[in-house]
């Protein structure tokens, strides 16, 4: 039996305060059904970060996975861009 294709999203880390968990904000462009204008929607996902590698401001890739807790259904795949430290 083959495994189905899992969803992959790219977003920005907005919180890394939890242990082994990051909150990733993903922006999606959708068209309004009535006014046909492009709207930017932001959705936040809690993702599993096993080694606590990602920091706030990093751009990351997350992939859908089995439920890991009440809210976590995504896991960190890679950090594509590090945030600039001030």
UniProtKB/Swiss-Prot annotation:
Q: Which UniProt keywords apply?
A: Ribonucleoprotein, Ribosomal protein, RNA-binding, rRNA-binding
What Gene Ontology terms for biological process does this UniProt record contain? translation
Q: Which Pfam families match?
A: Ribosomal_S17
Q: List the molecular function annotations (GO) for this entry.
A: rRNA binding; structural constituent of ribosome
Question: What's one GO-annotated cellular component?
Answer: cytosolic small ribosomal subunit
Q: What does this protein do?
A: One of the primary rRNA binding proteins, it binds specifically to the 5'-end of 16S ribosomal RNA.
Q: Which PANTHER family does the record cross-reference, listed alphabetically? A: 40S RIBOSOMAL PROTEIN S11 FAMILY MEMBER (PTHR10744), SMALL RIBOSOMAL SUBUNIT PROTEIN US17M (PTHR10744:SF1)
Q: Subunit info?
A: Part of the 30S ribosomal subunit.
Protein family membership: Belongs to the universal ribosomal protein uS17 family.
Q: Which protein is depicted?
A: Small ribosomal subunit protein uS17
Species name for this entry? Desulfitobacterium hafniense (strain Y51)
């Amino acid at each position: 039996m083959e495994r189905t294709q899992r969803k992959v999203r790219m977003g920005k880390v907005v919180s890394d305060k939890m242990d082994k968990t990051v909150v990733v904000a993903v922006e999606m462009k959708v068209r309004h059904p009535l006014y046909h204008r492009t709207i930017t929607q932001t959705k936040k996902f809690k993702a599993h970060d096993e080694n606590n590698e990602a920091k706030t401001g990093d751009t990351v890739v997350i992939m859908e996975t089995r439920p890991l807790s009440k809210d976590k259904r995504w896991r960190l795949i890679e950090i594509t861009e590090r945030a600039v430290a001030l």
